[in-house]
A protein has these predicted regions:
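Membrane-interfacial helix-loop-helix modules of multi-pass inner-membrane proteins that assemble, modify
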Residues: 26-37, 79-120, 150-157, 165-166, ...
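TM-adjacent membrane-interface loops and short helices in multi-pass inner/ER membrane proteins
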Residues: 114, 330-379, 393-399
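Transmembrane-embedded, aromatic-rich helix segments that form part
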Residues: 121, 163-175, 398-403, 449
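Transmembrane signal-anchor hairpin modules in multi-pass inner-membrane enzymes, especially those
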Residues: 1-50, 54-75, 132-146, 168-295, ...
Length: 463
């Protein structure tokens, strides 16, 4: 018999193919040394791919997820949240801003540097802790995750990056649907996600969401009340001006969590137990039907809301739906020019890419003067990881990367029904792949993605 430890998963195959695609991109590069080191970009050249590939293999084969990992990670992440909050309120404990020009300080935060990189970290960790709280097996863990989520959402305002709202919002919706779906499964007396949890995951979602909104509300009052950090806020961070709405939502979520928790306290529905004789088949069917209606109603409302938002925004020419060169802080300009560059590449480069971290070379060679005139800067990244891989590693690189992501999602979905420890990794991964549509790959938070993928592969292999 073949040991499960040595079972080859689809995600393993795609990881190897992704590394091979990176090697061919390295061969296709005009400056191979720059392609290897990534020195003309964000230091994510072929050497970086080799490192994350080696880490993936080691972790996927030899490591496993322990229950203590998430609480420790929560404490460490909480410190980075706290530092960003203090810096936002102009309290620089370690004088990290001393060597940064005053007009550039708003672009740097916490221990991560650029605000978009810190936002990427928030997109990884906040959904992770949300899921960890939903499926926590002890009350003290749920309290810890809720407190960390409270500070994490305060840090979202400090980050002042719209990326965070996108990367956190989508996993939150996914976790909401997972929590509701869990209730349907529970009343059907089937195996449920988080069957080892101390509490109902849907209740965990309510508590976590209450902590998040409450943290955002408190930070909004601190920012507007003291005036510190307010002037630099842009985009969605201007939600701090709507303090009354935030307060009402916070109160509703807190009261709703208390009422729901009190109502389900004696039911212990989160644990799959033998059928209770006192509960008739009719009652079970009725309850299951109610939760199914709630589930599909939420799905319908989300789809309808998205449709109405897009139609209304397009008709009223909202900035986010007006794609021009200035869209997304000039992301529209970069994407448009990179698509033109890709279309004009030789066939071999379309397949295998123009070389790892070659965006700076390509943009400078063709649009140097225009880029400076329009945007005022020189771009070395596509600010979209998928477009970045398409141009630098070709269609082969993009397909293998997407295959790695999709196969890892499949690993997580199959595993999460048996082991709730996988759900936080899956939620964090979703947060990252969503924010990657408008953010950059870099050697600070991108390795977390490959770590999560490797951990899920290892858990899947051992299951």
């Amino acid at each position: 018999a073949v040991s499960k430890k040595h079972t080859i998963l689809a995600s393993d195959v795609f990881m190897v193919l992704f590394l091979i695609a990176g090697f061919f991109a390295f061969l296709a590069a005009k400056d191979r040394m720059a392609a290897f080191t990534g020195e003309l970009g964000r230091r994510c050249g072929f050497a970086f791919l080799l490192l994350v590939g080696a880490a993936y293999i080691c972790v996927a084969v030899g490591c496993s997820v322990k229950e203590w990992i998430y609480p420790v990670f929560a404490c460490v992440s909480g410190l980075t949240y706290l530092m960003s909050i203090l810096q936002h309120l102009e309290i620089d404990l370690f004088h990290l801003y001393a060597s940064i020009r005053f007009d550039q300080r708003s672009m740097f935060i916490s221990t991560f540097g650029n605000i978009n990189i810190y936002a990427s970290f928030l997109c990884l960790t906040i959904p992770l802790f949300m899921a960890a709280g939903m499926y926590a097996d002890k009350c003290w863990k749920r309290v810890l995750y809720t407190v960390v989520l409270f500070f994490g959402e305060m840090a979202v305002i400090a980050a002042n990056s719209d990326v965070a709202y996108i990367g956190i919002g989508v996993p939150m919706v996914v976790l909401l649907l997972a929590g509701i779906r869990n209730r349907v499964k529970t009343y059907d007396d089937r195996m449920v996600i988080g069957q080892k949890s101390a509490c109902d995951p849907f209740l965990g979602w309510l508590i976590g969401c209450a902590g998040i909104v409450l943290g955002y509300t408190v930070m909004a009052f601190l920012t507007t009340g003291t005036g510190k950090g307010y002037d630099k806020l842009t985009g969605l961070a201007k939600l701090v001006d709507h303090r009354l709405i935030l307060t009402i939502v916070s109160i509703v979520l807190v009261i709703g969590s208390l009422l729901y928790g009190w109502g389900s306290r004696k039911k212990a529905d989160c644990v799959v137990a033998p059928k209770k004789a006192s509960k008739s088949v009719r009652d079970k069917k009725r309850t299951t039907g109610c939760w199914k209606i709630i589930f599909w109603s939420v799905v319908g409302i989300l789809i309808l809301t998205a449709f109405v938002t897009v139609v209304t925004g397009a008709n009223n020419q909202w900035e986010i739906f007006t794609f021009d060169d200035e869209w997304g802080n000039y992301r529209g300009y970069v994407w448009n020019r990179l698509f033109r560059i890709y279309q004009d590449l030789p066939f071999v480069n379309k397949v295998f890419g123009a070389g790892n971290e070659s965006i700076y070379t390509l943009m400078s060679a063709r649009y140097s003067d225009e880029m400076i005139e329009v945007t005022g800067t020189v771009y070395d990244s596509a600010h979209n990881e998928y477009l970045q891989y398409l141009v630098t590693m070709g269609i082969v690189g993009l397909i293998t990367y997407l295959g790695l992501i999709i196969s890892s999602v499949v690993n997580g979905v199959k595993l999460v029904k048996k082991d709730p420890l996988c759900m936080p990794l899956l939620a964090g991964m979703i947060g990252y792949v969503v924010q990657a549509f408008v953010n950059v790959e870099q050697p600070i938070t991108t390795p977390f993605l490959f770590l999560f993928l490797a951990l899920m592969a290892g858990m899947r292999r051992r299951s």
